[in-house]
From Swiss-Prot:
The entry's keywords: Antibiotic resistance, Cell membrane, Cell shape, Cell wall biogenesis/degradation, Hydrolase, Membrane, Peptidoglycan synthesis, Transmembrane, Transmembrane helix
Native source species: Saccharopolyspora erythraea (strain ATCC 11635 / DSM 40517 / JCM 4748 / NBRC 13426 / NCIMB 8594 / NRRL 2338)
Subcellular locations according to the entry: Cell membrane
Lineage, opening ranks: Bacteria, Bacillati, Actinomycetota, Actinomycetes, Pseudonocardiales
Catalytic activity: di-trans,octa-cis-undecaprenyl diphosphate + H2O = di-trans,octa-cis-undecaprenyl phosphate + phosphate + H(+)
Membrane topology label: Multi-pass membrane protein
GO cellular component annotations of the record: plasma membrane
Transmembrane segments: 4-24, 40-60, 84-104, 109-129, 186-206, 220-240, 251-271
Protein known as: Undecaprenyl-diphosphatase
Signal peptide: none
Domain of life: Bacteria
Task of the protein: Catalyzes the dephosphorylation of undecaprenyl diphosphate (UPP). Confers resistance to bacitracin.
Gene symbol of the encoding locus: uppP
Amino acid sequence: MQAMVLAVVQGLTEFLPISSSGHLSIVSKLFFGSDAGASFTAVTQIGTELAVVIYFAGDIVRLVVTWFRGLVNAEVRRTQDYRLAWYVIVGSLPIGVLGFLFQDYIRGALRSLWITGAMLILFGILMGLAERFGAQRRGHDKLTMRDGVLMGSAQALALIPGVSRSGGTITAGLSLGLDRPTAVRFSFLLAIPAVFAAGVSEVSHVFEPSAHGLQPTGAQMIVATVVAGVVGYAVIAWLLRYVQKHSVYLFVWYRIVLGLVLFGLLGFGVIQP
């Protein structure tokens, strides 16, 4: 039951800029008495990233084919798709390197709900500032390597629960002058290599007797991952439509209010950090 509930939470929150890992930690501690754990979070993210792969299958195939063709064809190397493929590759490096170097902190100390609450509020404010002051004039065809590096670096901050991978990358994209739909779409593409790598590397840790957090059976883990993916697919479709006509202020205020509520719950001892 716990694994299914948390899978739905994962699917609902993975692509919204409100921190899926933060929500998993809050819900699991508040309703089930213990943290779901970084390993469970990482593995269920495979399901949500499969949703991205299915949703953007056409884009992904085009980028992969163009990238391989560009390795041997100078004319192809001048296309935007070839450059975009490199932006995704380079932008995925920061989170991979930092995730490897600081994996013990990610599974342990950084999962304090005090940190989660602070990051929810801080990055909510930063997202609001990016929405308010970002130029939002550059579309998909204006993406650069600088965008890939800086948005990839922002993605790495999501190793801290409460930051939000999509929240960090969308905030960075808006700050760099990208329009909202472009920032969101590139955020999704940027996540695929890093999240799949993290999920695969954590599969064995979920079932270790000494592992921190939830320890589901193999069957429960598979079902939870599928559920997270199905819910996540619906959220992708909704979010892409939403940002076409709406600002991200809804998520800004949600993050700030949730962070304040979390501080209140911690302060009154309703939930343990």
